[in-house]
Amino acid sequence: MSATQNYGTGRRKTATARVFLRPGTGNISINNRSLDTFFGRETARMVVRQPLELTETTEKFDIYVTVIGGGVSGQAGAIRHGITRALIEYDETLRSPLRKAGYVTRDAREVERKKVGLRKARKRPQYSKR
């Protein structure tokens, strides 16, 4: 079974996605739900499909994903990263176009911590001169 399946782990913000690529017809299953029912936002669905559309493998694979943590945007980004890594494991020649599109690099931006004496990470209380 391992010969017919490719795996990739994707991360974004606090979300982690485990992605399995199997030969198929283009079904995308996330946490045992379809892509359309899992993501209400069209932008999130579009982000998930980006690496497949770039490599023209949309109808070639069935994708099974388990994703935990984060919110809608983080989970979509994590799935995209995982699909990219699984595609590279499937065919190393896809690395170059995926790298050019910026899908291979893990987006390292994280939420900045809240500081003591501030309302948020950088928002300060109003300053009064007198």
UniProtKB/Swiss-Prot annotation:
One of its GO terms (biological process) is translation. SUPFAM superfamilies: Ribosomal protein S5 domain 2-like. One of its GO terms (cellular component) is cytosolic small ribosomal subunit. Keywords: Ribonucleoprotein, Ribosomal protein. Pfam families: Ribosomal_S9. One of its GO terms (molecular function) is RNA binding. InterPro entries: Ribosomal_Su5_D2-typ_SF (IPR020568), Ribosomal_uS9 (IPR000754), Ribosomal_uS9_bac/plastid (IPR023035), Ribosomal_uS9_CS (IPR020574), Ribsml_uS5_D2-typ_fold_subgr (IPR014721). The keyword Ribosomal protein applies. Belongs to the universal ribosomal protein uS9 family. This is Small ribosomal subunit protein uS9. The gene is rpsI.
